[in-house]
């Protein structure tokens, strides 16, 4: 069996029709979903970009022992294991963070192709001072990230020049040139729909035609009151346009798989690393990246819950309720290919769920910032059993690190009057409060204690070093 693994960065689950969206056009991914096992309870594990890819490629819950860091030479990775078993392995990506500056996530692949220019990739040097599309105070890193990006795309002329298009074109070309290299593992990683958001105008017109204001293509991560209502609507439209752009080009790759006669013996996996807040909880971004509130954002479902669909030969399509997380992808691929799963892997194969043999692989899911920094309130872990979700900051916290709502205005789009329960744990009952707006920790502390205890046991089973686990053994200081 061949494998094509597609990771699309910052892709909100609820922006896909197969997960219930009714206003964004995603016909190709919805078609893939109809032919796949779709995981309703797929959730991120290590957050954000680079930790997620390390989870995927090592099969480990890496937030328990590391953070955003290069891939070390001694960690067992999927490509090496598959290569040793006789697979031809290839990485094609435009996500710069996992290969630039010695990050080395290409290790183990027989070949890799980096499509240059995404985000702040230091690629092009002209124009020296490109004009910003809006007031700089509305942008994240306007003088560095945004201007570098504008240099990188200055000579873009057609849709084929966009990053996701270039990446999928390269993936199609590799398939065409390597038909004799079966079995293969093709890993495709596109940074879209991550910011900056500047899809072709025809995609934007689907969602906000006639807009005349500033183009906030890379909004700063902060409470969202810096945007007017029309700007916030347009930012959402830009992102939706990026989602449809990704759908278009992933669709072309899927069609090429069919045209090359590969479908009957090729598994396709589509997923992401995390989502994004577009005003939910009063926030813009996936976190707050600012000196005074760095990382002080709980990982609510808009960020923590992710799409995951797997189309594999012989598997019955349908929606499944089993928890699935990025560390599960490596053992799943190895299981389906008949390759022994290394002892280093902490994830669980989803193959029994794909075959309809099992309904669940674990009782709960953990989504977390790295926990290696000690007793900081700003390193949240989300613990869920599907009915209840506990947002846990560690036992000792500094309320000043979680007071972001105090600088948010009180207009209707700000959904929470207080933020992060003044820094303490938060508990939500998902069936009655899916938007996670009413913290019921005080009323259901016994439920919170149960989830917390399960989370500690899981961390122990993962071999979390005690120096990182110590601060997480207490639910909260009394």
Please provide the spans of the model-predicted regions.
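Active-site-proximal N-terminal segment of extracellular/periplasmic enzymes that hydrolyze or transfer
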Residues: 1-40, 46, 438-445
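Active-site regions of oxyanion-processing enzymes, predominantly non-cytosolic
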Residues: 1-5, 106-113, 147-152, 156-213, ...
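C-terminal, low-complexity/hydrophilic appendages and adjacent surface loops
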Residues: 301-302, 371-441, 478
């Amino acid at each position: 069996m061949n494998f094509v693994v597609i990771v699309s960065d910052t892709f909100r689950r609820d922006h896909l029709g197969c997960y219930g969206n009714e206003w964004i056009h995603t016909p190709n991914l919805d078609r893939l979903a109809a032919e796949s096992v779709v995981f309703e309870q797929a959730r991120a594990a290590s957050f954000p970009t680079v930790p997620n890819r390390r989870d995927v490629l090592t099969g480990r819950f890496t937030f328990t022992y590391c953070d955003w860091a290069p891939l070390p030479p001694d960690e067992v990775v999927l490509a090496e294991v598959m290569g040793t078993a006789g697979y031809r392995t290839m990485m094609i990506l435009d996500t710069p963070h996992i290969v630039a500056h010695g990050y080395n996530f290409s290790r183990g692949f027989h070949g890799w192709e980096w499509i240059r220019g995404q985000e702040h990739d230091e690629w092009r040097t002209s124009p020296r001072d490109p004009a910003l599309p809006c007031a700089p105070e509305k942008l994240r890193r306007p003088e560095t990230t945004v201007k570098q990006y504008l240099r990188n795309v200055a000579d873009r002329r057609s849709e084929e020049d966009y990053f996701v298009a270039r990446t999928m074109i390269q993936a199609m070309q590799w398939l065409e040139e390597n038909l004799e290299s079966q079995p293969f593992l093709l890993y495709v990683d596109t940074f879209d729909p991550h910011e900056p958001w500047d899809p072709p105008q025809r995609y934007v017109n689907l969602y906000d035609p006639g807009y005349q204001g500033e183009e906030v293509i890379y909004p700063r991560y902060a409470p969202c009151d810096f945007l007017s209502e029309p700007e916030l609507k347009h930012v959402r439209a830009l992102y939706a346009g990026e989602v449809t752009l990704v759908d278009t080009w992933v669709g072309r790759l899927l069609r090429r798989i069919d045209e090359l006669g590969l479908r009957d013996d090729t598994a396709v996996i589509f997923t992401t690393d995390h989502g994004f807040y577009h005003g939910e909880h009063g926030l813009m971004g996936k976190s707050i990246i600012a000196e005074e509130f760095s990382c002080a954002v709980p990982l609510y479902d808009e960020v923590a819950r992710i799409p995951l669909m797997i189309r594999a030969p012989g598997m019955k399509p349908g929606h499944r309720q089993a928890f699935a997380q990025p560390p599960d992808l490596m053992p799943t691929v190895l299981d389906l290919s008949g390759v022994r799963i290394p002892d280093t892997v902490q994830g669980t194969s989803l193959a029994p769920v794909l075959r309809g043999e099992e309904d669940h692989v674990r009782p709960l899911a953990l989504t977390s910032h790295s926990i290696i920094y000690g007793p900081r309130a700003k390193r949240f872990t989300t613990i869920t059993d599907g009915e209840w979700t506990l947002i846990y900051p560690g036992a000792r916290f500094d309320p000043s690190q979680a007071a972001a709502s105090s600088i948010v205005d009180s207009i209707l789009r700000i959904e929470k009057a207080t933020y992060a329960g003044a820094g303490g744990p938060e508990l939500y009952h998902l069936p009655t409060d899916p938007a996670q707006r009413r913290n019921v920790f005080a009323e259901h502390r016994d439920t919170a204690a149960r989830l917390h205890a399960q989370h500690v046991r899981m961390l122990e089973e993962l071999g979390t070093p005690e120096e990182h686990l110590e601060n997480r053994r207490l639910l909260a200081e009394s």
